């Protein structure tokens, strides 16, 4: 379940608010808080649900989960819209911040585990299909996509197919550079991509 209260202190354009991932806003809240609207989004399909049976790289067994990064639908917000990525329906959603009504949805070929980063009218979202998508933040129209690896190889995962190099990080814009990563297993290469966001 995705439940939000309308708190219009300032925009929250990227995962955990800013490029430092501080999770802190300069805005203030007026108490008591009240629920403005809520959206039933179902439960996320986590990438690594539960403890690890064994570590294929080292051979260790009886491990606890160390990758519990997607137990809920995280949100970003900018210019009157609230955004979230969905591992349940492999998409990016944009909602009206005032009413909670869906404004647009964009589907990818695999789960979207973190919210898009909003920068100068563009929503950047990574997907387990191995691509970073650039979407018009107001309309959801596809602008471009960039594969995070040199080839498009897929493997089975959670009753679906994902890239051997999924984009499981929230994109980050620092200055005029867009950063994202593509990686999954320690025995395959990992990629850090720096790109022009425009």
Which residues does each predicted region cover?
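Bacterial N-terminal signal peptides
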Residues: 1-5
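Aromatic (tryptophan-biased) beta-strands that constitute blades/sheets of beta-rich domains
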Residues: 10-76, 81-83, 91, 101-108, ...
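Repeat-blade elements of multi-bladed beta-propeller folds
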Residues: 12-16, 63-92, 106-133, 160-193
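Short, surface-exposed, charge-dense and proline/glycine-enriched linear segments
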Residues: 44, 55-58, 135-136, 175-180
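Glycine-rich active-site/cofactor-binding loop and its immediate structural neighborhood
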Residues: 95-97
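Beta-propeller blade signature
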Residues: 135-136, 140, 190-198
């Amino acid at each position: 379940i995705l439940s939000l209260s309308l708190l219009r202190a300032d925009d929250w354009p990227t995962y955990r608010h800013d490029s430092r991932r501080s999770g802190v806003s300069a805005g203030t809240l007026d108490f008591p808080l009240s629920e403005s609207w809520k959206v039933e989004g179902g439960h996320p399909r986590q990438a690594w649900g539960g403890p690890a049976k064994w570590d294929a790289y080292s051979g260790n067994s009886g491990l606890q989960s160390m990758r519990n990064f997607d137990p809920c639908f995280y949100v970003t917000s900018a210019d009157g819209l609230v955004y979230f990525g969905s591992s349940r329906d492999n998409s990016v959603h944009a909602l009206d911040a005032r009413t909670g009504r869906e404004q647009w949805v964009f589907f990818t070929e695999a789960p979207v585990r973190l919210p898009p980063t909003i920068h100068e009218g563009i929503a950047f979202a990574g997907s387990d299909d191995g691509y970073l998508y650039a979407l018009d933040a107001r309309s959801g129209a596809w602008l471009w996509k960039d594969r995070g690896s040199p080839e498009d190889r897929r493997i089975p995962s959670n009753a679906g197919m994902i890239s051997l190099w999924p984009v499981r990080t929230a994109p980050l814009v620092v200055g005029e550079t867009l950063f994202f990563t593509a990686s999954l297993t320690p025995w395959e290469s990992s990629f850090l991509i720096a790109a022009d966001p425009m």
